[in-house]
Amino acid sequence: MTHSRFLAACRRQPVDATPVWFMRQAGRYMPEYRAIRERYGFLEMVKTPELAAEITMQPIRAFSVDAAIIFADILPLLEGMGLHLTYEQGEGPVIHNPVRSPADVAALRTPDPRETVAYTIQAIRLVKRDLEGRAPLIGFSGAPFTLAAYAIEGGSSRDHRLTKALMYAEPQAWRELMERLTAQVSAYLIAQIEAGADAVQIFDSWAGALAPGDYADYVLPFVQKCIIAVRAGCGIVPPPPIIYFGVGLSGMLGLLRQTDADVIGLDWRIHLDDGWAQVGPGVAVQGNLDPHTLLAPWTEVRRRTADILDRAAGRPGHIFNLGHGIVPETPVDTVRRLAEFVHEYSAE
C-alpha cells in the first residue's frame, strides 16, 4: 500500500490521526455476521474462503477502521499436525487427542501450512482483491506457546497445569514441541504475507499464565526465533510489521521488548503510557481499552478513550485498539462512534 495510517504507526512514523482497528472486529456483535452464522458452523466459515472473506470485509464496510484482519482461527494449524479439533456447543474448542508425552510430541506431523490451511491463504487473496487498496490487511497466528497449551490441555484451561507439568518434567520434549510449532507458525505467517497480508499479529493468549522466569526460559526464545524467521523468509524489504500481543503480560513488558516485534499489544491492565515506558521508545504500542467498556454509556466510553489518547500524547507509534477482542454484547453503534471519535480526537 502506498499510504496507510496503520502501517505508518506500526513503523513509528507520524500520522494525521491515530489509526484504529479492533480485535474480533468481525464477530457475533454484528448482525451481518450472525446472519451467516445461522447458516454455517464456525469451522465451516473459517474453512470456506468466500465466507471468511465476506466476514472480514463486514467491519470495513460498517466502520471507519484503518485495517482489516482476516477472519480465521488459530487452532486449525494444529489439525495439519495430526490433532483432531472440534468446536463443541458451550465448551469451545476441544482437541480429542491431546499431546501429553514425549511420544505424542514425536508423532506430530510438520506439513506445509500452505496446504493444510490453504483456505485461509485463499481467503487473504480474496480480501486483498475486495479491499482494492482501501485498507491494509492483517494476517495472524497463534504463538507457539499458546498453540502448545491448547494441544496439551485439549482445550481451554484455567491454570494450564498439564502444560506446565510437561514443560517442567519433560524439557527435551517441550523444546521439540516448541521447535515444531515455531516452524509451523513461521511458515504460516510467511504464507499469509506471500498471499498479500500487509502486517501480521502473533496472539499469545495464554502466556499470561506463566511466571516471568518461565516465560523467559520456555517461551521467549521461540517467539524471537519465529519473528526472525518471518522477517528472513517473507522476501519483502522492509518486511511487513509484526505485532505481538498477549493477555495478562503487563508484568513482563520488559521481556516482551526482547521479542523484537515492531508493535507490542497491551491489554487493559496497565496505563498505556506506563506500558509504553516499559517496552521502550523503539517499539510501537497497540491498545488498550478494556473491551467491556463498550457496554457502558457512550459518555464513559468517550472519557476512557480520550484518557488513552491523552496518555499516548500524539507520539508516533500508537495504534488504538481494545485490550482484547470485542465481546458479543457490544452495541454496533458504539463501535462505529468509537472509531470515528479516535480519529476526530487525535487529529485535533
UniProtKB/Swiss-Prot annotation:
One MF term in the entry's GO annotations: uroporphyrinogen decarboxylase activity
Protein name per Swiss-Prot or TrEMBL: Uroporphyrinogen decarboxylase
InterPro entries the record matches: UROD/MetE-like_sf, Uroporphyrinogen_deCO2ase_HemE, Uroporphyrinogen_deCOase
Lineage of producing organism: Bacteria, Bacillati, Chloroflexota, Chloroflexia, Chloroflexales
UniProt cross-references to Pfam families, sorted A to Z: URO-D (PF01208)
Chief localisation class: cytoplasm
SUPFAM superfamilies listed in its UniProt record: UROD/MetE-like
Pathways involved: Porphyrin-containing compound metabolism; protoporphyrin-IX biosynthesis; coproporphyrinogen-III from 5-aminolevulinate: step 4/4
Enzyme class: lyase
Binding site for substrate: 24-28, 73, 150, 205, 324
Site-annotated residues for Transition state stabilizer: 73
